[in-house]
Amino acid sequence: MAREKFDRSKPHVNVGTIGHIDHGKTTLTAAICTVLAKEGKSAATRYDQIDKAPEEKARGITINSAHVEYSSDKRHYAHVDCPGHADYIKNMITGAAQMDGAILVVSATDSVMPQTREHILLARQVGVPRMVVFLNKCDIATDEEVQELVAEEVRDLLTSYGFDGKNTPIIYGSALKALEGDPKWEAKIHDLMNAVDEWIPTPEREVDKPFLLAIEDTMTITGRGTVVTGRVERGELKVGQEIEIVGLRPIRKAVVTGIEMFKKELDSAMAGDNAGVLLRGVDRKEVERGQVLAKPGSIKPHKKFKAEIYALKKEEGGRHTGFLNGYRPQFYFRTTDVTGSISLPENTEMVLPGDNTSITVELIAPIACEKGSKFSIREGGRTVGAGSVTEVLE
């Protein structure tokens, strides 16, 4: 599919379908595209186009996920749908497809199932702020009392995981009937989009967040000082501003005396740019790859944190055997590896390839991280897992 010109006039929001296998996530994704295509707000996308999701790599991990685009009257959406349960877990933990909100699909014929719970928990852990519920297959489970009972169960479940279950919108629909063009059920897709427009918050743009650049390389320019290069992850940096150098060593401040991109001098660099930053009064020996430049006070170095991780299966290039408490791999944050030890939850003896679990990590050197920071777990240079920081401890 050719990328159309990106319409910047509407706010951009990333969403995704989550929920138990065969509850209708992919059918709903196809239905949204098909119904909105009638109004020219999406490209019509068939079920099999979404189901044959292409492979992509994120943090050394292969993930299958399908991406579609559509618009409502208010916003432009990028929507991700994953074919397999493991793909969802990998997607959420690696942040391969950022989700500003989710559409939770629950079948009215089955109610809440194990993956429903797991996806809600993961969404909570990785910081998805809100979700809208689509109660699917209401053309089959026509008994209104049954539908109400399922809706109540979903609300209770959302509340138990820290979401606002009481006020979360629940749309009663049939993805299949909407996909087939039945007007009664097509109307429910419009109801769903209105709920997504209203309930899922517009995310803060990356450029409006506090400045952060991950250092990839350092060099000395004779007579001018030290230059660090790297990609601006978020925010904006202007010449003359003071920044902090964070991670691996004690925090130190420095003033930016120049910014360069593609061999041109610039006044500023912003989110997404690869830039060289000239720092006054910093010796090259005092900065290194793996540190970050950041707006003062915006991020702290931490050695100990809690995380949600996914251990790669053997077929995915992961370990052939599980790992125990005290396992010491490398944790790759942004641009560098730091060794650390893993503590498993109380009743977990071992993490097997293909598992996802919560762990506590203690690194040998502090690294700039915060809730939501992503990392890879590596052993001898190969990726054996992926993780997302859920809480910083010290």
Curated annotation (Swiss-Prot):
Record keyword Lyase present: no
Every tr-type G domain range: 10-204
Region (G1): 19-26
EC numbers for this chain: 3.6.5.3
Keyword Cell division found: no
Lineage: superkingdom: Bacteria
Keyword line: Cytoplasm, Elongation factor, GTP-binding, Hydrolase, Magnesium, Metal-binding, Nucleotide-binding, Protein biosynthesis
Cellular compartments annotated: Cytoplasm
One Pfam family hit: GTP_EFTU_D3
Binding site for Mg(2+): 26
Chain intervals for the UniProt region annotation (G3): 81-84
G4 as annotated region, ranges: 136-139
A cellular component term, taken from the record's GO annotations: membrane
Region (G5): 174-176
Catalyses which reaction(s): GTP + H2O = GDP + phosphate + H(+)
Residues binding GTP: 19-26, 81-85, 136-139
Record-level Gene Ontology MF annotations: fibronectin binding; GTP binding; GTPase activity; translation elongation factor activity
G2: annotated span: 60-64
Role according to the record: GTP hydrolase that promotes the GTP-dependent binding of aminoacyl-tRNA to the A-site of ribosomes during protein biosynthesis.
Family: Belongs to the TRAFAC class translation factor GTPase superfamily. Classic translation factor GTPase family. EF-Tu/EF-1A subfamily.
Assembly and binders: Monomer.
Protein name in UniProt: Elongation factor Tu
Organism: Mycoplasma pneumoniae (strain ATCC 29342 / M129 / Subtype 1) (Mycoplasmoides pneumoniae)
